[in-house]
């Protein structure tokens, strides 16, 4: 790509950001790249089939108009998926896997391509009863906001699919902190997916998966367990961070591979991204990262207010006289910032106090009842990728330079500063930091940390730079 094309692309992105707004741009366009400009066509790419489909369906004309404002001669936008476009030709696959992927591309009729990996047996095994589902956790009760737009759209896409449809992204991996809505989305997928009766959607916690596998081994029914699991249309796994044990992880990996290769959908949730699941085998992490990985961010005040109103409406369905005044809702939304469960707990407390004491809800009552839920603002969670990006921009190098093996002075110092910040601003271990910096050994990270620690004590310029970087990352 030429410099002039890159400059044009930057202006188009700025125009697109202004047109759709910051939230929409971040959700759908932040990972879109320019590949080439040829004659009257512009070739763009995105990392997943889901993003490609969504942009084509909802924003194609807008992207084209932004390009035409920059280059009037452009009349066509070609959007492709980077992973499919840039990967080397794979080795010859087993027939089932090949046919399943043809179905994803639309090269063959889906009905002819969704052959199961094994002949499914009756789903009578204890583990296939699934984990309990909460009837309240549906799409209808899920409140959508800036923090969860992409995760909700992806989950809805899975739930609305039909048997025989090509799988757009696999697996769908959703990660977030406690109480931000992961389980709600996964159970909503399960409820909606099973509603039509056409597909079998199974929801399991990682703990239930482990229990089922161990029980099957003890009862010598492991083969039935495996066959039944691999006959599922959509497998939904919650709290993957709790998956332990080499044999259990190996079986999970085999199940994951078998379902994906057969064109079956897998949806997974955990409290961290795949790369941070250090207890999992590298093969599992790699497979998880190959799908659509979506983070659900912390709840903004508007979203917290929406959740509170939703919970009040749900409570009013059973207690018609229950009401929470707007000033009380505003106070709760401002004050309870930790997670959605605390918000629901606050409404439950107000309901109980109001009903048991036959008193209306007031601001004074709310302040008394939820005092323990009002917590100090948590510090911003800083990611190693954010550190690399900010440091690279500060020292005018690229992120790939920081991850490379280059040893030139203009790269070594920024890399050491980034490693130092990763150690001081995150909870990541030295081996994990080294792995995020191009697979370096933990001793290299330790050397960098000690080097910068020594220098900031005597080099005021470097100390000022490091402190400025910390402020940027923490703001």
Swiss-Prot record:
Keywords for this protein: ATP-binding, Cytoplasm, DNA replication, DNA-binding, Lipid-binding, Nucleotide-binding
Binding positions (ATP): 179, 181-183
Localization per record: Cytoplasm
Region named Domain II: 73-131
Region called Domain IV, binds dsDNA, residue ranges: 355-475
PANTHER family, A to Z: CHROMOSOMAL REPLICATION INITIATOR PROTEIN DNAA (PTHR30050:SF2)
Family, as annotated: Belongs to the DnaA family.
Cited HAMAP family: DnaA_bact
Protein name (database record): Chromosomal replication initiator protein DnaA
Source organism of this protein record: Bradyrhizobium sp. (strain BTAi1 / ATCC BAA-1182)
Gene name as annotated: dnaA
